[in-house]
Amino acid sequence: MSLKQFSLEGKKALVVGGRRNMGKGFALGLAEAAADVVVTDLAVEDGALQSVADEISEMGRRSAAIQADISSKQSVSELVDQTISVLGGLDVLMNVAVMYHRKALPDLDEDGWNQLTNVNLKGYWLMHQAVAPIMQAQRSGSIINLSSRGGLKAHADKGMGNYAIVKAGVAMMTRQY
């Protein structure tokens, strides 16, 4: 299928959680549709994030791999500033970052809960806070949050219940914008 009908020529995108799996796929898809794309992730040691940025560059698009901790307001601010510096603007934010602990809720400790909510909920919120004013000022832009059908109903796998809870929060936050 040709993506020409979905051309994003001239658009600038930031994919949070773009190192592998769905995030990588979305980043490459945006680039295939002619968008310039910055990818970010917390983990960069394995070289996978840079590899995604290199693939995007090989498509003739501007790209960069930027390490960021989206649970930190300062890190998010620096990420957005660097993205705008590299791309010359920002039209699309795609929040794909995810982390989960495969534990039933009664077995999840406070540190695990904090890690889960810091990435999957607080991180998305901080990204919204940093990007929404930019998009409002330019009177255009799109924020796309990856949730999960698991966030719409109770998860059959009790070890995934904690993930379902934060993804329900992401779905509701998205509806509020």
Where are these regions (language model features)?
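Substrate-binding pocket helix/loop in short-chain dehydrogenase/reductase
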Residues: 104-105, 112-114
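Canonical Rossmann dinucleotide-binding motif of NAD(H)/NADP(H)-dependent dehydrogenases/reductases
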Residues: 8-38
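Conserved NAD(P)H cofactor-binding loop of Rossmann-fold oxidoreductase domains
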Residues: 96-101
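Active-site helix of classical SDR
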Residues: 128, 166, 174
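Residue(s) in the substrate-gating loop at a strand-loop-helix junction
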Residues: 148
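Conserved glycine-rich Rossmann-like NAD(P)H-binding loop of the short-chain dehydrogenase/reductase
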Residues: 35-50
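The beta1-alpha1 cofactor-binding region of Rossmann-like NAD(H)/NADP(H)-dependent oxidoreductases
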Residues: 46, 67-79, 110
